[in-house]
Amino acid sequence: CKQIIQNHTMSTTSTHYVYQEPAIEFVTVAVQLCLYLEQAEEQERADFIEKMLCLLPLLYLKARLLPKATEEMDGYPERFVTEYEYESMRQAIAQKLGSDDAYLEVFVEDMRYSDEPITAFISENIADIYQEVKDLACNYQTREEAVMNDALVSCLEAFEQHWGQKLLNVLRPLHTLSLHVDE
């Protein structure tokens, strides 16, 4: 993905939103996260936790730094992550974390209507994030500015609506796990 962007910026003086520095940096981190998650099964548990504690906050920061853009096409960007891929990702992370996958969450909408803590899962939240940023990365590979633009717009809207909060929510339990990784 980074090579696509570099090739384009070398061959043109385009200042389109999708080639501006904040967009390039966000997509670069998104691609790094996707590549790492796709190799999650091969990673040691401690390394996985540590890498998530580095990549997720960086992804959050890069998303926050993205300026607003407007859609250029009708409809929604193409979705690439299948239900099977999503579930495989979720299961790989859940297996890696074992019983530590579940955590009590208070920053969810359902908490308003409950006196009991809500159980959430690191694996599910990370799989949700993966789905959004992988779809973005795949749309970027089309090299069509309008498609890339609308994929960024859609990903940023989803960030504001749900996956930004999910990202922040998993940092707490991941931080705790990182402190007790040897136990």
Predicted regions and their residues:
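Solvent-exposed, charged interface segments at domain starts and junctions
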Residues: 14-38, 101-124
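Generic intrinsically disordered, low-complexity segments enriched for polar/acidic and small residues
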Residues: 5, 14-16, 23, 45, ...
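Charged, amphipathic alpha-helical oligomerization/scaffolding segments
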Residues: 25-32, 51-58, 62, 88, ...
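Acidic, proline/glycine-rich low-complexity IDRs
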Residues: 13, 117-120, 128, 132-183
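N-terminal interaction modules that seed assembly of large macromolecular complexes
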Residues: 11, 17-18, 24-83
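Long amphipathic alpha-helical segments
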Residues: 68-137
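Short, Lys/Arg-enriched N-terminal segments with co-localized hydrophobic residues
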Residues: 1-9
